[in-house]
Amino acid sequence: FPIHIKLDTGMHRLGFQENNLPELIKTLQGNEAVKVKSILSHMATSDDLAHKEFAISQIELFEKLSSQLMAELKIKPIRHILNTSGISNYPEAQYDMVRLGIGLYGVSNDDEEQKYLENVGTLKSVISQIRTIEKGESVGYGRRFMAERQTKVATIPIGYADGISRHLGNGVGYVIINQKKAIILGSVCMDMLMVDVTDIECKEGNTVIIFGERPTVSEIAKLLQTIPYEILTSISQRVKRIFYRE
């Protein structure tokens, strides 16, 4: 059976530590039932150059431990330690392969690098209904949006059950309708959210961009003080996926 050995070089989440190696080697020596296909580790700070010294220490420990395993077990497996940020910041540690994760989706943790990347995914919805409310009227649960003028409101059938954070409500987040920004009004509901389209020419059935070229996943992450990974992985399974091939 093929197996993959993960080494804990400082992340302290999963893997064999240095003091585990003698027992691991003893267990594997002469065991013909398994074959080591790869040795890997994971970097804790590859995206943060303020911790470059720690990152380098992880790479050095990985080199030491993986080399020890290879020598004592007389094997030549694939070795890998770098994720997306590691590929950019520590190219000298690419070994036999790298793990391009969020980079596959056109997202980088580096603002300068991001200029050369495009988001590969777009989250879309449509306008379900448009209504006009008067000054003093409210929108949504808790009346958290109170109109200060006559306001045209569009309802979009997507909400926090689909992965849209409630923290984007009350004017924090926005969507794009016909190339224009529409601010989210009041609270994001479970299955719907409402936006201000007072100054936007639009009609029911028009496409709504939740994220894509604008706003990007990274921009939404900054609004929520989180990371792009969380935005992407929060999109629930009930959201239909459409894949395009070139």
Tell me the role of every PLM-derived stretch:
Residues 1-2, 9-126, 133-134:
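Active-site loop/helix belt of alpha/beta enzymes
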Residues 132-246:
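C-terminal accessory subdomain/extension
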Residues 7-9, 84, 158, 213:
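Residues immediately flanking
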Residues 4, 93, 172-176:
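Amphipathic repeat-derived elements
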